[in-house]
């Protein structure tokens, strides 16, 4: 009995080797289950291969960056979804902000640089100094490229809504003048818009007044020096 069983097993093994090692159905499995069992190793191998390829790509990318080959991806160039990242704003608000951003992106490069920001503030009726414009950009410039991406532009309104901007700062003025659309908000919106515009003009006027005051002070000091020199010369002439 044992000899017959051993002979049967050897015969079975020889048959499998003769057929090229093809697997037969496992005992207790139907045809579909056997096919799934046969395909499982292939799927596992494919998944492992895909993971290996992804890991290899990341390692090669990191090696290139370490060797100075290629450029790291800055936050401003990463693809982001404004509707999920800036959930505090409605889709309409984000669309309006995007429309405004594109309006002043004269170079159509996806950024608002210093000169484009200068033009924007002038058109909004709140011109800024060169240092003021640089300060505005620096406050939200996360990647330190000295210009505003659309994401950084949205950060201005996030900070304004959260009360994180100074009352008379350039970014606060920009947010106030930009957030109201007179054509869609009606009389109340127009009232708020012009109130914000008046405040922005007042800030600009105060800045101009400070400059004029400094100029007047310098003129006054120069006049006093001139008068002292004249008095000294007159005093000298009396002793001649």
Swiss-Prot record:
What keywords is this UniProt entry annotated with? Acetylation, Calcium, Membrane, Metal-binding, Phosphoprotein, Repeat
Name of the protein described by the UniProt record:
EF-hand domain-containing protein D2
Q: Boundaries of each EF-hand domain copy?
A: 92-127, 128-163
Residue numbers carrying Phosphoserine? 11, 74, 76
Q: Where is the composition biased (Low complexity)?
A: 32-47
Phosphotyrosine modification, residue list: 83
Signal peptide boundaries: none
Q: Which residues carry this modification: N-acetylalanine?
A: 2
Name a GO molecular-function annotation. Answer: calcium ion binding
Residue span of region Disordered: 1-51
Q: Can you tell me which residues bind Ca(2+) 1?
A: 105, 109, 116
Gene3D superfamilies the record matches: EF-hand (1.10.238.10)
Domain of life here? Eukaryota
Q: CDD domains in the record, alphabetically?
A: EFh
Give the species this sequence originates from. Answer: Mus musculus
Which residues of the sequence carry a binding annotation for Ca(2+) 2?
141, 143, 145, 147, 152
Purpose: May regulate B-cell receptor (BCR)-induced immature and primary B-cell apoptosis. Plays a role as negative regulator of the canonical NF-kappa-B-activating branch. Controls spontaneous apoptosis through the regulation of BCL2L1 abundance.
Task: Cite the record's note on assembly.
Answer: Interacts with CASP9; with inactive form.
> Which positions bear N6-acetyllysine?
233
Q: In which tissues is it expressed?
A: Detected in thymus, kidney, spleen, lung, liver and brain. Highest abundance in brain and lowest in kidney and thymus.
């Amino acid at each position: 009995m044992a000899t017959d069983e051993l002979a049967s097993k050897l015969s079975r093994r020889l048959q499998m080797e003769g057929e090229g090692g093809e697997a037969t159905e496992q005992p207790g499995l139907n045809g579909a289950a056997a096919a799934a069992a046969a395909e499982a190793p292939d799927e596992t191998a494919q998944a492992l291969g895909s993971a290996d390829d992804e890991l290899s790509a990341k390692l090669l990318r990191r090696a290139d960056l370490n060797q100075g080959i290629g450029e790291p991806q800055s936050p401003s160039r990463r693809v982001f979804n404004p509707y999920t990242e800036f959930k505090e704003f409605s889709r309409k608000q984000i669309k309006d902000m995007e429309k405004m951003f594109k309006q002043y992106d004269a170079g159509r490069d996806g950024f608002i640089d210093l000169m484009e920001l200068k033009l924007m503030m002038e058109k909004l009726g709140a011109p800024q100094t060169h240092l003021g414009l640089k300060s505005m950009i620096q406050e939200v410039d996360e990647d330190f490229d000295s210009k505003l991406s659309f994401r950084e532009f949205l950060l201005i309104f996030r900070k304004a809504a959260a009360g994180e901007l100074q009352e008379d700062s350039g970014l606060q003025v920009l947010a106030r003048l930009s957030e109201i659309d007179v054509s869609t908000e009606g009389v109340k919106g127009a009232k708020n818009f012009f109130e914000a515009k008046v405040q922005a003009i007042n800030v600009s006027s105060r800045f101009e007044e400070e400059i004029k005051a400094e100029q007047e002070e310098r003129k006054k000091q120069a006049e006093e020096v001139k008068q002292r020199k004249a008095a000294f010369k007159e005093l000298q002439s009396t002793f001649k």
